[in-house]
Amino acid sequence: MGSFDKAKWVWHNSYRGKNVYVNFEDKFTLKSAPSSCKVKISCDRSYALYVNGEFAHCAQCSDYEDLKFYDEVDITGHIKPGENELFVTVYYQGVSCSTYRCGEPGLIFEVIADGGVVCASSERTVAYKNSAYESGEGVEWVTVQLGIGFHYDATREGEREGEKYADIVEKTYDIRPRPVKLLKIEPPKSAGLINKGVFFDLADGTPAQKMQAAALAVQYVCGSLPLPSEEGIKLSVEGSYKGHEPDGVFAIADLGEESTGLLLLDLEVPHECDVYVGWGEHLADLRVRAHVGGRNFAVKYRARAGRNAFFAPFLRLGLRYLELHVYARECTLYYTGVRPTVYPLPEPAEPPITDGLHKKIYEVACRTLQLCMHEHYEDCPWREQALYTMDSRNQMLCGYYAFGETRFPRASLELIAHSLREDSLLELCSPAEVAITIPSFSAMFLVQLWEYLDF
């Protein structure tokens, strides 16, 4: 049986603009629990998959409209006898950047249990807008490389705006298996709260601009307070302030090392309020540098009264530090951090050195390389996460030695090759549409190919 023999590309045609999130629901019934159950899934730009209310996976291998890939996700552990529910949220950015080449919106999936298709996307799949995510032009870009950030309103969860059966849309059915391994989405990374206090807004603008300009009044923290915390860490306005009252409480968490992952929040507030979350790699400003020359390394979360647990599956962060600005006079923080996203690799080769310092440099270099490997090589884990020929050439050379595998570099080379333009130059990044290109980077691609064959 071929891939997607019974499935159709679906969408909700009322939501075809920029920066939209659409939910899809389907059901299937099994007499008994299968020994194996998998989902084959593809979309434009990324998806989050849930089975029977449990998170199963999120991703989308970087591809092109005429070179589509699908993921195969094992959901056996989520399946039960009787009726099973499949829930998918798809994020469609609808505008190209350095890490995404815009295609037509669409989702396709098949559920295969013990070798047979038991559920497939079709005109009977239910579709509706995910209203918790703000859609449209009002959400700021993180960077021109990464694309658009997000504003999420937890008070709007459960809305089913525009609910109807899905529309069938035209996209290619020549969909290939993901050329690289699925990422491991790990449990929450341990962190430590290293600073807290109150903040005073001094500027308007995006969440990142407001965080960067805010005045901070620090409260004493003894060392680092571990996160996650079962009992929670109390944040509150203490004492009185002359003049302007604080706008809320803040906290800074340290993940202990450079990391890549998906944002996870767990906090409790007495009333609805905004929570700004900024991230960065250093604290040179005595805070996270959330706003850098028009770039916005912060997102907005609207918390409902009470306990809030939030997982953000569509934007991978590169960071060491997280900063929260909570627009309330008190808050209990149980966790802020990430679920690391890790590309599975063998243990690095042992270097022929015995000196401790040089061995440490080698270990850090191997970890840095892995932090720049997800769907393809990335020039950096934080600001761009983009595939360039010149950058990836050096990464490939290091990877051949350190990890001894060629599957990942081959996939990146194929993505680059598919970006060939009408003027016989390559796009600056792949897959992407960028206003400029660098001719010498196109020339370097030939060197990469030769080195791939040589190694």
Model-inferred region functions:
Residues 1-382, 391, 407-412, 416, ...:
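Extracellular/oxidizing-compartment recognition motifs
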Residues 44, 387-391, 404, 436-447:
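Aromatic- and histidine-enriched alpha-helix N-cap/loop-to-helix transition segments
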Residues 394-405, 445-455:
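Well-ordered alpha-helical scaffold segments within catalytic/enzyme domains
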Residues 432-437, 453-455:
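The substrate-binding groove and active-site-proximal loops of carbohydrate-active enzymes
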Residues 387, 399, 413:
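Functionally critical mobile loop/hinge segments
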